[in-house]
Amino acid sequence: MQFSCDPDQEGDELPQYEHIYQNDFSYRKHKKQKEEDISICECKFDFGDPDSACGERCLNVITNTECTPGYCPCGVYCKNQKFQKCEYAKTKLIKCEGRGWGLVALEEIKAGQFIMEYCGEVISWKEAKKRAQTYETHGVKDAYIISLNASEAIDATKKGSLARFINHSCRPNCETRKWNVLGEVRVGIFAKESISPRTELAYDYNFEWYGGAKVRCLCGAVACSGFLGAKSRGFQEDTYVWEDGDDRYSVDKIPVYDSAEDELTSEPSKNGESNTNEEKEKDISTENHLESTALNIQQQSDSTPTPMEEDVVTETVKTETSEDMKLLSQNSQEDSSPKTAIVSRVHGNISKIKSESLPKKRGRPFSGGKTKNVAQKHVDIANVVQLLATKEAQDEVLKYEEVKKEAAVRLSSLYDEIRPAIEEHERDSQDSVATSVAEKWIQASCNKLKAEFDLYSSVIKNIASTPIKPQDTKTKVAEAGNEDHIKLLEAK
Ligand SMILES: C[S@@+](CC[C@H](N)C(=O)[O-])C[C@H]1O[C@@H](n2cnc3c(N)ncnc32)[C@H](O)[C@@H]1O
């Protein structure tokens, strides 16, 4: 179904995308749930107690698995088919300053409640990375790809549900949870706390950061991490200082992709004060909004501001004027040197800016979960080899050096392969890295450590058995002097 816009509406155009209620499986077939894989709970429905049907104590609910219709003992009374039945909370699409569109609650939402499913195209991680790069090159300003499992992602850029509009917050009131539904993993947005009507929904993206432009976070939380995805491994690897004295990638030098640039009204005034009431009113009157219910999306052509919208706008204005934001905005707007150039989502030619001012992403592999602030001193094997006396010794050290290099390359390429699983595990405590993936990683890490150990023990062994070369006369005299000195000391 095409999500259409009302051409009479004022303000920003509504986004164009295809609205879907279930994940799209064009990339691969939907798995067919085998009968032996269907998990059947032990709930018994009691007509006198409607809560007896698949509630908190249902074995399937406890294991984040939806009951399979036709197999649940509670039959049609089963309450554990929320994804399948699209039992969504009522929400409304609204324009949020600086952050594009967002979703607000239209009703009281209880802590832990299922809000809606994050639907999109199910694609492989390889495809996801490719698409992310293509979108960026084509100037697609918002990112809609999220992790599904170790090997797949959901891309809601072209096809998706309303969940694609939920913005990020470093202090979120929602979270994503993975559920098993009829043999497939599906991602749901759940309330982390009770949410009152008119409150914007937000979860912590903590998403994969693929390199390239970074988006400044405008969530306004006190403990805001500064950038979207700033906690992701990729982002940290790219922005941390890696070598002594090499601060090319330190956080204060990275180019910024600033979503606040999109809307003129979101720019803080020169003196750092918040927008005037007049500006706020203008913002409110030009807002567009959509309302969602469980099974339909209705457009609203009403352009009169409701108290809820005013709240939302006021909230974002406050956000913009917090002390942290003032500092961030001033930095980004005043400094236009190539190193700190603002990468605008609207005006900037992303690929041009990328090639001119973004530092090249280094292929530094994941280093065992630790960011590297202390530079590791590398032994220069070529120099060491020159010191060795025999050809055999040299060959041995060179052979171990080769093995060490291969092990490092293997670990590095493996990291690219399994990074989604590692990050998913770090992000989402309910998931665990598949044993096969963990085993591969441990094996490759051990191989690299062993290769390093073999190399350095070979260096030590061969250096130790290399006779000291005859030295020039000057050195000899100096050493002789030292010997005398030692003897003298001994004599005393
Ligand atoms: C999944 S979309 C969310 C919906 C989006 N606002 C829209 O209009 O379609 C993610 C994008 O929204 C923007 N965004 C979300 N949360 C943000 C935040 N806290 N600060 C700045 N931009 C944000 C970023 O451009 C991000 O790539």
Swiss-Prot record:
Pfam families in the record: AWS, SET
EC numbers for this chain: 2.1.1.354
Domain Post-SET stretches: 213-229
Keyword Mitochondrion included in the entry's annotation: no
Iron-sulfur in keyword set: no
Annotated region (Disordered), positions in chain: 259-340
Compartments reported by the entry: Nucleus; Chromosome, Centromere
Keywords annotated in UniProt: Centromere, Chromatin regulator, Chromosome, Flowering, Methyltransferase, Nucleus, S-adenosyl-L-methionine, Transferase
GO biological-process terms attached to the record: DNA repair; flower development; methylation; response to UV-B; vegetative to reproductive phase transition of meristem
Catalytically driven reaction(s): L-lysyl(4)-[histone H3] + 3 S-adenosyl-L-methionine = N(6),N(6),N(6)-trimethyl-L-lysyl(4)-[histone H3] + 3 S-adenosyl-L-homocysteine + 3 H(+)
Main subcellular localisation: nucleus
Compositionally biased tracts (Basic and acidic residues): 277-290, 317-326
Annotated GO CC locations: chromosome, centromeric region; nucleus
Residue ranges constituting the SET domain according to the UniProt record: 84-206
PROSITE patterns: AWS, POST_SET, SET
Domain AWS: 36-87
Signal sequence, renumbered to the chain: none
Domain of life: Eukaryota
Role description: Histone methyltransferase involved in regulation of flowering time. Required for the expression of the SOC1/AGL20 gene. Required for histone H3 trimethylation on 'Lys-4' (H3K4me3) at the SOC1 locus. Prevents trimethylation on 'Lys-27' (H3K27me3) at the same locus.
Family assignment from sequence similarity: Belongs to the class V-like SAM-binding methyltransferase superfamily. Histone-lysine methyltransferase family. SET2 subfamily.
Protein name: Histone-lysine N-methyltransferase ASHH1
